[in-house]
Swiss-Prot record:
Functional note: Plays an essential role in transcription initiation and cap-stealing mechanism, in which cellular capped pre-mRNAs are used to generate primers for viral transcription. Recognizes and binds the 7-methylguanosine-containing cap of the target pre-RNA which is subsequently cleaved after 10-13 nucleotides by the viral protein PA. Plays a role in the initiation of the viral genome replication and modulates the activity of the ribonucleoprotein (RNP) complex.
Domain of life, source organism: Viruses
Organism: Influenza A virus (strain A/X-31 H3N2)
Record gene name: PB2
Classification lineage: Viruses, Riboviria, Orthornavirae, Negarnaviricota, Polyploviricotina
Family: Belongs to the influenza viruses PB2 family.
Gene Ontology biological process terms from the UniProt entry: 7-methylguanosine mRNA capping; cap snatching; DNA-templated transcription; symbiont-mediated suppression of host cytoplasmic pattern recognition receptor signaling pathway via inhibition of MAVS activity; symbiont-mediated suppression of host gene expression; symbiont-mediated suppression of host mRNA transcription via inhibition of RNA polymerase II activity; viral RNA genome replication
Protein name: Polymerase basic protein 2
Length: 759
């Protein structure tokens, strides 16, 4: 206050005012400050005094031929004086106005294509809805966000090659366009930009916006998808927020969202299969998201989410070095520890073997709805500062930190036995056992933790065991803060290893991720996810499993038929029959299987009893481990549509309906495909026509290898012998004729010879 009074006093004297307004600036330091270097020191002032001049703009000489010397009002538009130090002319701002009104019109067809990202942004804002403004404290945390809606996901190098190819196709320099997306984009853009007059540099800049993901590390308190980030300045301030619903979606956000859903579904499914890693890879390679191969998206998309990271690690890609526990991302910010196995006793006197981290460490914990700073020593929580959206989110973070601290009072707070299992029915590791236990009910944990009086620190308050805030007391070491904890900003990626149970370790052997960390949240994907792997058939429920299993048999019938007669055990073990087993009542599975296998063996032994439709229908039942029993069945039960439905052993039913005339199969009323080969019993005619050029020598001879299908016969050399599977499921030995002349007689003799060879 004193200084302000003093200044007011000074200003009231006329001499002060005169000195400040009239004195010239002749101090060398000041002159230097404003004249050294090319960088403009006061752009606003410079602009003002430039524009006060008559001709502040310079232009190419050619402009004098395109613009009149004076406008309609008789004002001069350009000066006859040359610009000092260049051969350009001095032009008045009025010339710009004249040009905008009367200058040549160019073709605007390319503008929406080049400035696509801008045009789309305008549309989104036009159709977006802004809601009320709320004044409240904003817990913002810095997150790495995508600031550029509507982009493809090319790497900088890939994009550079595409841009060079589109904008400067004749420039020298090796450009290799390999990925499918590169080729598609290049073709599309070349067509769009034919005869484009916009400067190539501008086109290149705009293409870069469309092709490359741009991320920034920004403070955010709400949605993080790019259509929210583009209006960040409109939706959240320091103490206010405005509700906003985007007026459109962009593909890059949809890809991110669908990728997370696909990855979660795949990891959950792989975790319960016999070889999780192999299954996961098989599924990633056979899945498409929005028509693009999932593995291509994984290579390009920087999304960091537990399931996505597991898929990336399985593919040998680098991932972030932070680790996950209880749905929070932990990043160690200081300290270090060594790990040692230790046995501890729970409150229920159950022994747990845990890996104890010995040493002082500090971590940041970042979750979707809460963040925290954790300081801990060996099996002791020193301090936990949490901030979160609501009481529930704050409680989640506290539970995770307390379990992670491995404190004795946490382990002693366990009531009852710990026997949580994962989806594959395997026991969880001790740390996850503890986590699940307290996530179900943390009352005892919070009560046993202990409270302490707290000092009044700005921006921090205490929290009591019942989760109510307090300014006097708080649970030991725990404080609630108004400020969020920033996400880890580095984009550094590290090499990791993955074991067959999908546990991911860094090079020091620390576990960064495991399937237990994958969220159980279900969502609906924005883009179509196509899982081609049989392991994902069950994602759409039992009906889909049934239809898909039969579709698979029909599509692969040629190979299935050969295996059925030659190597049935291998056929029964095919993974494509795995999902089907979940539809068959557990108690009777083995009996069904034994019954079908016996039936099939009789078909192989007794000639002429081969029945294509019946084999297709019963085959999936034979895949379960068989139990020998004398039971006979006329129908099998499958659990679909919420109840048991029946498949008749002989004949059609609503579940399995094969039309012999059209060779079309419908399963539960859905089309399951058409059989390409003739399943009727009278196939001798067809076979004899196909066997032209082959001499039938007699019964199957094992020395000549496994039976070929009729289609494979064409590969035989003249005089070569082979076993062939013919329509009735019987195998005969044939030889390819050395001379072509006798072909005609083959078709007549074939029919007789087949009958003889068989009988």
């Amino acid at each position: 206050m004193e200084r302000i009074k003093e200044l007011r006093n000074l200003m009231s004297q006329s001499r002060t005012r005169e000195i400040l307004t009239k004195t010239t600036v002749d101090h060398m330091a000041i002159i230097k400050k404003f004249t050294s270097g090319r960088q403009e020191k006061n752009p606003a002032l410079r602009m003002k005094w430039m524009m006060a001049m008559k001709y502040p703009i310079t232009a190419d000489k050619r402009i004098t031929e395109m613009i009149p010397e004076r406008n309609e009002q008789g004002q001069t538009l350009w000066s006859k004086m040359n610009d000092a130090g260049s051969d350009r002319v001095m032009v008045s701002p009025l010339a710009v106005t004249w040009w905008n009104r009367n200058g040549p019109m160019t073709n605007t067809v390319h503008y929406p294509k080049i400035y696509k990202t801008y045009f789309e942004r305008v549309e989104r804002l036009k159709h977006g809805t802004f809601g009320p403004v709320h004044f409240r404290n904003q817990v913002k945390i810095r997150r790495r966000v995508d600031i550029n809606p509507g982009h493809a996901d090319l790497s900088a190098k890939e994009a550079q090659d595409v841009i060079m190819e589109v904008v400067f196709p004749n420039e020298v320099g090796a450009r290799i366009l390999t990925s499918e997306s590169q080729l598609t984009i290049t073709k599309e853009k070349k067509e769009e930009l034919q005869d484009c007059k916009i400067s190539p540099l501008m086109v290149a800049y705009m293409l870069e916006r469309e092709l490359v993901r741009k991320t920034r590390f920004l403070p955010v308190a709400g949605g993080t998808s790019s259509v929210y980030i583009e209006v960040l300045h409109l939706t959240q301030g320091t103490c206010w927020e405005q509700m906003y619903t985007p007026g459109g979606e962009v593909r890059n956000d949809d890809v991110d969202q669908s990728l997370i859903i696909a990855a979660r579904n795949i990891v959950r499914r792989a975790a319960v299969s016999a070889d999780p890693l192999a299954s996961l890879l098989e599924m990633c390679h056979s899945t498409q998201i929005g028509g693009i191969r999932m593995v291509d998206i994984l290579r390009q998309n920087p999304t960091e989410e537990q399931a996505v990271d597991i898929c990336k690690a399985a593919m040998g890609l680098r991932i972030s070095s932070s680790f996950s526990f209880g749905g929070f991302t932990f990043k160690r910010t200081s300290g270090s520890s060594v790990k040692r196995e230790e046995e501890v006793l729970t409150g229920n006197l159950q022994t747990l073997k845990i890996r104890v981290h010995e040493g002082y460490e500090e971590f940041t914990m970042v979750g979707r709805r809460a963040t925290a700073i954790l300081r801990k020593a060996t099996r002791r929580l020193i301090q936990l500062i949490v901030s979160g959206r609501d009481e529930q989110s704050i409680a989640e973070a506290i539970i995770v930190a307390m379990v992670f601290s491995q404190e004795d009072c946490m382990i002693k707070a366990v009531r009852g036995d710990l026997n949580f299992v994962n989806r594959a029915n395997q026991r969880l590791n001790p740390m996850h056992q503890l986590l699940r236990h307290f996530q179900k009910d943390a009352k005892v944990l919070f009560q046993n933790w202990g409270v302490e009086p707290i000092d009044n620190v700005m921006g921090m308050i205490g929290i009591l065991p019942d989760m109510t805030p307090s300014i006097e007391m708080s649970m030991r070491g725990v404080r609630i803060s108004k400020m969020g904890v920033d996400e880890y900003s580095s984009t550094e990626r590290v090499v990791v290893s993955i074991d067959r149970f999908l546990r991911i370790r860094d090079q020091r052997g620390n576990v960064l991720l495991s399937p237990e960390e994958v969220s159980e949240t279900q969502g609906t994907e924005k883009l179509t996810i196509t899982y081609s792997s049989s392991m994902m058939w069950e994602i759409n429920g039992p009906e889909s499993v049934l239809v898909n299993t039969y579709q698979w048999i029909i599509r692969n019938w040629e190979t299935v038929k050969i295996q059925w007669s030659q190597n049935p055990t291998m056929l029964y073990n095919k993974m494509e029959f795995e999902p089907f087993q979940s539809l068959v009542p557990k108690a009777i599975r083995g009996q069904y299987s034994g019954f079908v296998r016996t039936l099939f063996q009789q078909m192989r032994d007794v000639l002429g009893t081969f029945d294509t439709a019946q084999i297709i229908k019963l085959l999936p039942f034979a895949a379960a481990p068989p139990k020998q029993s004398r039971m006979q069945f006329s129908s099998f039960t499958v659990n679909v549509r919420g109840s048991g439905m029946r498949i008749l052993v002989r004949g059609n039913s609503p579940v399995f309906n094969y039309n012999k005339a059209t060779k079309r199969l419908t399963v539960l009323g859905k089309d399951a495909g058409t059989l390409t080969e003739d399943p009727d019993e009278g196939t001798a005619g067809v076979e004899s026509a196909v066997l032209r050029g082959f001499l039938i020598l007699g019964k199957e001879d094992k020395r000549y290898g496994p039976a070929l299908s009729i289609n494979e016969l064409s590969n035989l050399a003249k005089g070569e012998k082979a076993n062939v599977l013919i329509g009735q499921g019987d195998v005969v030995l044939v030889m390819k004729r050395k001379r072509d002349s006798s072909i005609l007689t083959d078709s007549q003799t074939a029919t007789k010879r087949i009958r003889m060879a068989i009988n």
